[in-house]
């Protein structure tokens, strides 16, 4: 086994840091990099300040076909494929750059990211294993993620035809509940202002009768 040069080792460290900053799990690092497990654990602790989490990685391809996850995953994978095929980036560079572009797109549109880096990495592996494929939408002509043996003709993507429950998430319901007391407070404040204005007008009219009538006639 040939020994790696210092520059190659440094590049591996930088790649590991980039993946850790984006939220990669240890299984992702071990699959993509040649650094020892001990070094990657040390890097993870230095970058994140905590030990790497344990547990299994996502393993179901069905998650990527649910309506909201499908839109986000399709956006990422089309970006990844462009960087790999058109920009000639390596797999790892396309993964990190594509995921950064995905996060930037979510921030620009003020949307919460649905896809984390581990799921993005798993998505690429599902495509490499021919479990998933890109299916063209018959309305927008965009390509979205579907199972390998799903229908290819006259299929509509979730962006063009979202389900009836779209937008009715727990977060949206919580935001609506939080906004309700604020609306009540604003209404009460408006009522208070109106009451104060009426009382002020009545007080002035009592002290100086006919003042407002003269002001209106003069106007």
UniProtKB/Swiss-Prot annotation:
Entry similarity comment: Belongs to the FlhC family.
Cofactor dependence: Zn(2+)
Protein name listed in UniProt: Flagellar transcriptional regulator FlhC
One annotated Gene Ontology cellular component of this protein: cytoplasm
GO terms assigned for molecular function: DNA binding; zinc ion binding
Cofactor binding comment, as recorded: Binds 1 zinc ion per subunit.
HAMAP family to which the protein is assigned, alphabetical: FhlC
GO BP: bacterial-type flagellum organization; positive regulation of DNA-templated transcription; regulation of bacterial-type flagellum assembly
Database matches in Pfam families: FlhC
Described purpose of this protein according to its UniProt entry: Functions in complex with FlhD as a master transcriptional regulator that regulates transcription of several flagellar and non-flagellar operons by binding to their promoter region. Activates expression of class 2 flagellar genes, including fliA, which is a flagellum-specific sigma factor that turns on the class 3 genes. Also regulates genes whose products function in a variety of physiological pathways.
Binding positions for Zn(2+) per the UniProt entry: 137, 140, 157, 160
Assembly: Heterohexamer composed of two FlhC and four FlhD subunits. Each FlhC binds a FlhD dimer, forming a heterotrimer, and a hexamer assembles by dimerization of two heterotrimers.
Species of origin: Paraburkholderia phymatum (strain DSM 17167 / CIP 108236 / LMG 21445 / STM815) (Burkholderia phymatum)
Keywords: Activator, Bacterial flagellum biogenesis, Cytoplasm, DNA-binding, Metal-binding, Plasmid, Transcription, Transcription regulation, Zinc
Broad class of where this protein is predominantly found: cytoplasm
Localization: Cytoplasm
Gene expressing this chain: flhC
